[in-house]
Amino acid sequence: MPFLCVNVDHVATIRQARLGIEPDPVTAAAMCELAGAVGIIMHLREDRRHVQDRDIELISKTIQTEFHFEMAATEEMQQIALRIDPATVCLVPEKREELTTEGGLNCIGQEKRLTEYLAPLHEKGIGSSLFIDADADQIKAAKAIGAEYVEIHTGHFADAPTRSEQKAELTRIIDGIKMSQDLGLKVNLGHGLNYVNILDFADVPGICEYSIGHSIMSRAIYVGIDRAVRDMVEIIRNFAD
């Protein structure tokens, strides 16, 4: 059975709108755990636009499930990851002008650099994931780099303007999942997934985790974090193993 990991970055976004102390993403993370999430995700961006260093320090010390740390492949983030010792790091691309991550990491041509970058993290027992598009060459590069997981970017699927385009993206993602699995990579999915479009993956076997943040926190405004997380956990619980 696949599992749910909740991204609490959007709680930090609301807090930073007033540069205050609430809502606290650390408190939100604990509530997500109590509601059934098996992992908490935070992305510490280089510009610190939402999550702050204080947040990841506290999360790493307080959560009872797994902490998945999203980060750019910079020296600063590598040192932070080595210090806080998350369950996994997920390398993602960053552009300062983007509102949110717009696409997958380009691994092609970076195999040597990223292999060397991840080496000290692997030596410490930290798992690794690469956030990539469902592209055959990217998947092959991820395998060459030695990542344990790939998180396949589902944003183009989620944002497709028509059902036919969405189906085409779905096919591309499913092909990417199968190829990743054939190469021995574990597969997570994330970006833009919500309570409706996630149903398209109900019969797709072998997905380890779904990484979901925005849609859960959006629903939480109306029904609360506990109910919003439990609703998503219940949907995923019925998916293929």
From Swiss-Prot:
Sequence intervals crossing the membrane: none
Enzyme class: transferase
Stored InterPro entries: Aldolase_TIM, PyrdxlP_synth_PdxJ, Pyridoxine-5'_phos_synth
Family: Belongs to the PNP synthase family.
Gene Ontology terms, MF aspect: pyridoxine 5'-phosphate synthase activity
Function of the molecule: Catalyzes the complicated ring closure reaction between the two acyclic compounds 1-deoxy-D-xylulose-5-phosphate (DXP) and 3-amino-2-oxopropyl phosphate (1-amino-acetone-3-phosphate or AAP) to form pyridoxine 5'-phosphate (PNP) and inorganic phosphate.
Associated pathway: Cofactor biosynthesis; pyridoxine 5'-phosphate biosynthesis; pyridoxine 5'-phosphate from D-erythrose 4-phosphate: step 5/5
Binding site for 3-amino-2-oxopropyl phosphate: N7, R18, G192, G213, H214
E.C. no: 2.6.99.2
Keyword terms: Cytoplasm, Pyridoxine biosynthesis, Transferase
Amino acids binding 1-deoxy-D-xylulose 5-phosphate: D9, H10, R45, H50, T100
Entry's Gene Ontology cellular component terms: cytosol
Chief subcellular location: cytoplasm
CDD domains the record matches: PNPsynthase
Gene: pdxJ
Catalytic activity of the protein: 3-amino-2-oxopropyl phosphate + 1-deoxy-D-xylulose 5-phosphate = pyridoxine 5'-phosphate + phosphate + 2 H2O + H(+)
Gene3D superfamilies, alphabetized: Aldolase class I
Active site: H43, E70, H191
Location(s), subcellular: Cytoplasm
Domain of life of the source: Bacteria
Subunit and partners: Homooctamer; tetramer of dimers.
BP term (GO), one: pyridoxine biosynthetic process
Site (Transition state stabilizer): E151
Name of the protein in question: Pyridoxine 5'-phosphate synthase
Xref: Pfam families: PdxJ
